[in-house]
From Swiss-Prot:
Residues 26-35 have a biased composition (Pro residues). PROSITE patterns: NATRIURETIC_PEPTIDE (PS00263). This is C-type natriuretic peptide. Disulfide bonds join 110-126. It is found in: Secreted. The gene is NPPC. Residues 24-73 form a propeptide. GO terms for molecular function: hormone activity; hormone receptor binding; signaling receptor binding.
Length: 126
């Protein structure tokens, strides 16, 4: 378990060091991301009542489709990475079930049958 935590920390530090710093003076300021529903809804509202058959100069419809697919792809990658981190940090979802094992151990009688409590305590099981 300690080894997996050490690897997770090392991976996190590596990812943070590779990530471009937001404090660089030449970098443009980042615009905060809006929820996916709002971002997709705004360009459709700006288009007005245009139909699919209407052509706009500059191919605005293709750009909208590309933005939407890029947004969906980014969301899918984010979900996959979160699932990977959850698996890494929590080795098994029911780890408590498997960690303890049996506290008292299975008391088996002469014929391999589990003894009841009275039989195991008094020795009358065999």
């Amino acid at each position: 378990m300690h080894l997996s935590q050490l690897l997770a920390c090392a991976l996190l530090l590596t990812l943070l060091s590779l990530r471009p710093s937001e404090a660089k003076p030449g970098a443009p300021p980042k615009v905060p991301r809006t929820p996916p529903g709002e971002e997709v809804a705004e360009p459709q509202a700006a288009g007005g009542g245009q139909k699919k058959g209407d052509k706009t100069p500059g191919g605005g419809g293709a750009n909208l489709k590309g933005d939407r697919s890029r947004l969906l792809r980014d969301l899918r990658v984010d979900t996959k990475s979160r699932a990977a981190w959850a698996r890494l940090l929590h080795e098994h979802p029911n780890a408590r079930k498997y960690k303890g094992g049996n506290k008292k151990g299975l008391s088996k009688g002469c014929f391999g049958l589990k003894l009841d409590r009275i039989g195991s305590m008094s020795g009358l099981g065999c």
